[in-house]
Swiss-Prot record:
One of its GO terms (molecular function) is beta-amylase activity. This is Beta-amylase 3, chloroplastic. It comes from Arabidopsis thaliana (Mouse-ear cress). GO terms for biological process: maltose biosynthetic process; response to cold; starch catabolic process. The lineage of its organism: Eukaryota, Viridiplantae, Streptophyta, Embryophyta, Tracheophyta. Redox regulation; active in reducing conditions, inactive in oxidizing conditions. It comes from the Eukaryota. Keywords: Carbohydrate metabolism, Chloroplast, Glycosidase, Hydrolase, Plastid, Polysaccharide degradation, Transit peptide. The active site is at E259 (proton donor), E456 (proton acceptor). Coiled coil: none annotated. Disruption phenotype: Slightly retarded growth rate and reduced starch breakdown in leaves during the night. Substrate binds at D127, H167, D175, K371, H376, T418, N457, A458, R489.
Length: 548
């Protein structure tokens, strides 16, 4: 069965319909040798060969000509600052690949991808879990489940965003399954608990390796940065012929939930609850050693013995603490010293990881991106407490997002930001939230830095208000429009009638730069992208497409 989308911007045309039918019945037990380059011919006007940069500002690394830079960093899906059309991707389930390394529910996945193609989405996003791929031992990589997925995505003419997920799955908002770090890594952590982030009371967080040991060979002779780099290099070697084609984007995970931040608000075991301020994560021996060295370097040795003693606990509000209250310690000489170090370490971590990723994927034709968390609670206070504990030095007096945007731009990396769907009026008054103000600040920061901006919704939403907020954000004049939007997440509820119709209308609106109208019940343009058509196609596959 085929879904055709006459107005699609898909670059791929099948050369052999017979092989397409054969691939549809692919077994869940298939194994793959190293994948060969795709056998599709590219026909669109915006093909890799013809595509040009139209950005107002383009970072050119020292020693490289602009022409060479353009060739090495060609866009993988069409969009520019002068093009209002925004491609929409959909996140796949967290357990898309099973713990045994196979594609989960391949028949349902096939039907779901067919439906998404019919809805006009550009592609899908999947997590490449460190805990799955390298679980059998150091540098022993198993990409088989992802190979199955890539072939299936390609068959449907979709694109793929792949997240290099170096964090644990489980224990945070929306986590529906548990995928820990690789067993051999957990073994090293059991021997040396300081390898993971630690709060002031000594609680260890196993979500992600502490950035304090980034350059220390603590993982069986390799540093964490080397381990992450080897993982990414293995991915490039395995899927060489697909990166820059069906694999349009590589998102580099840089912390918990794949975000560049500290795990300051862990939900597991009720440690944190919204809208708590969270806690600083700087008490493993590697972070404490770094803090001490930084304090000594500026002649303030006594400041390096510990983090702030008056910063409260996870569930506190800012005014409950001496550090975060209106005129608190955050605004003192000591507070500025500590936040410069704490946020600086996070920036350094991101810089090292993105530098490595750029070296590995440069010239592949795929975009590189990284994710920054949308921490919107207490944004309307002076200290922005929840942002500070996460590592974003953003206060009434200090812009925390411009340095991040500049660091992303240095490496030619797209900044992917969450909470694009949220409105201020939807938030509880006591939490002093402003997701809209936060998004505007990040838009302005990326515009000022010359960095591309992409977006995600932070929470599972299906209503027109949430979709409308994303559309409004994209066409806002306050800063950068979006280069892409990734919807969270494909599941059973997404395929329900009204929810599905909202998604189809949203995709069309984003393609039209936010100026689209509600979809007609009849097709008068021959686009195959109207409600009646989609409902008919979904009805044929609804049982298979509804992933649990």
């Amino acid at each position: 069965m085929e879904l055709t989308l006459n107005s699609s911007s898909s670059l791929i045309k099948r050369k052999d319909a017979k092989s397409s039918r054969n691939q549809e019945s692919s077994s869940n037990n298939m194994t793959f040798a190293k994948m060969k380059p795709p056998t599709y011919q590219f026909q669109a006007k915006n093909s890799v060969k013809e595509m040009k940069f139209t950005h107002e500002k383009t970072f050119t690394p020292e020693g490289e000509t602009l022409e060479k830079w353009e060739k090495l960093h060609v866009l993988s899906y069409p969009h520019s600052k002068n093009d209002a059309s925004v491609p929409v991707f959909v996140m796949l389930p967290l357990d898309t690949v099973t713990m045994s390394g196979h594609l989960n529910k391949p028949r349902a996945m096939n039907a779901s991808l067919m439906a998404l193609k019919g809805a006009g989405v550009e592609g899908v996003m999947v997590d490449a879990w460190w805990g799955l791929v390298e679980k059998d031992g150091p540098m022993n990589y198993n990409w088989e489940g992802y190979a199955e997925l890539i072939q299936m995505v390609q068959k449907h003419g979709l694109k793929l965003q792949v997240v290099m997920s170096f964090h644990q799955c489980g224990g945070n908002v929306g986590d529906s399954c548990s995928i820990p770090l690789p067993p051999w890594v957990l073994e090293e952590i059991s021997k040396n608990p300081d390898l993971v982030y630690t709060d002031k009371s000594g609680r260890r967080n196993p979500e992600y390796i502490s950035l304090g040991c980034d350059s220390v060979p603590v993982l069986r002779g390799r540093t964490p940065i080397q381990v992450y780099s080897d993982f990414m290099r293995s991915f490039r070697e395995r899927f060489e012929g697909y990166i820059g084609g069906v694999i349009a984007e590589i998102q580099v995970g840089m912390g918990p939930c794949g975000e560049l931040r500290y795990p300051s608000y862990p939900e597991s075991n009720g440690t944190w609850r919204f809208p708590g301020i969270g806690e600083f994560q700087c008490y493993d021996k590697y972070m404490k050693s770094s803090l001490q060295a930084y304090a000594e370097s500026i002649g303030k040795t006594n400041w390096g013995t510990s983090g702030p003693h008056d910063a409260g606990e996870y569930k506190n509000l800012p005014e409950d603490t001496e550090f975060f209250r209106r005129d608190g310690t955050w605004n003192s000489e000591y507070g500025k010293f500590f936040m410069e170090w704490y946020s600086g370490k996070l920036l350094e971590h991101g810089d090292q990881l993105l530098s490595s990723a750029k070296g590995i994927f440069q010239g592949s034709g795929a975009k590189l991106s990284g994710k920054v968390a949308g921490i919107h609670w207490h944004y309307n206070t002076r200290s922005h407490a929840a942002e500070l504990t996460a590592g974003y030095y953003n206060t009434r007096n200090h812009d925390g997002y411009l340095p991040i945007a500049k660091m992303f731009n240095k490496h030619g990396v797209v900044l992917n930001f969450t909470c694009m769907e949220m409105k201020d009026g939807e938030q509880p008054e006591h939490a002093n939230c402003s997701p809209e103000g936060l998004v505007k600040q990040v838009q302005n920061a990326t515009r000022q830095a010359g960095t591309e901006l992409a977006g995600e919704n932070a929470l599972e939403r299906y209503d027109s208000s949430a979709f409308g907020q994303v559309v409004a954000t994209n066409r806002s004049d306050s800063g950068n429009g979006l280069t892409a939007f990734t919807y969270l997440r494909m599941n059973k509820r997404l395929f329900e009638g009204q929810n599905w119709q909202q998604l189809v209308e949203f995709v069309k609106n984003m393609k039209e730069g936010g100026h689209g109208r509600r979809l007609s019940k009849e097709d008068t343009t021959g686009s195959d992208l109207y409600v009646g058509f989609v409902k008919g196609k979904i009805a044929e596959n609804v049982e298979e497409a509804a992933l649990v």
